[in-house]
Regions:
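Extreme N-terminal, non-catalytic leader segments
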Residues: 1-38, 79
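Short gly/ser/thr-rich secondary-structure transition/capping motifs
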Residues: 9-15, 81-84, 121-124, 144
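Short loop/turn elements that form and flank the Walker-type P-loop nucleotide-binding site
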Residues: 24-26, 54, 93-95, 133-136
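Walker A/P-loop phosphate-binding motif and the immediately C-terminal alpha-helix
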Residues: 28-65
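Generic secondary-structure signature for well-ordered alpha-helical cores
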Residues: 30, 53, 75, 125, ...
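Short glycine/serine/threonine-rich phosphate/pyrophosphate-binding segments
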Residues: 38-46, 68-71, 143-151
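Phosphate-binding loop that captures ATP/GTP phosphates
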Residues: 57-59, 63-109, 114, 121, ...
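Phosphate-binding/switch loop-helix module in NTP-utilizing enzymes
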Residues: 106-152
Length: 152
């Protein structure tokens, strides 16, 4: 098989995983703003935490790869996630909150992440496709600032 066919098949498989995962999530909410530093992450964390405290199975995806701050806000910056051949398992905060953040994957939490557009989008796609969110009532997404500005 040619390399381009392999990439195409891989892309189709990724799309199928993303679709399959998203179908298990009743409501997807992206907290967005056209400007940085306005409290987007704070709103996302508080919304996810409140929904989980009310008994809703909730996921929080910190897709801001340049400055993942949700782990610090939740006090779980030292918590570990499990990643194996079956995918990535988000950190759980009992009783109903699951969290995935780029912050879990960085060895140096203060080091800047400098990625170009396609790599950034690939990371976000992987967070949705490879993370085992399970059945959720809500997935709260704190997106990249660039994605927020695209929608404003």
């Amino acid at each position: 098989m040619k390399k381009s066919n392999l990439n195409k098949n891989e892309s189709i498989n990724d799309d199928l995983k993303i679709t399959e995962n998203l179908q298990k999530i009743k409501h997807k909410i992206a907290v967005m703003s056209g400007k940085g530093g306005v409290g987007k992450s704070t709103v996302a964390v508080n919304l996810a935490f409140e929904l989980s405290m009310r008994g809703a199975d909730t996921g929080l995806l910190d897709a801001d790869i340049h400055g993942p701050s949700t782990l610090k806000m939740l006090g779980i910056e030292n918590k570990q996630i499990i990643a194996d051949n079956n995918g990535i398992f988000p950190a759980g905060i009992p009783p109903h909150l699951k969290v995935m953040s780029m912050g879990f994957l960085l060895s140096d939490k203060d080091a800047p992440v400098i990625w170009r557009g396609p790599v950034k989008m690939g990371a976000i796609r992987q967070f949705i496709g490879d993370v085992h969110w399970g059945n959720l009532d809500y997935l709260i997404i704190d997106p990249l600032q660039e994605l927020s500005m695209c929608r404003s």
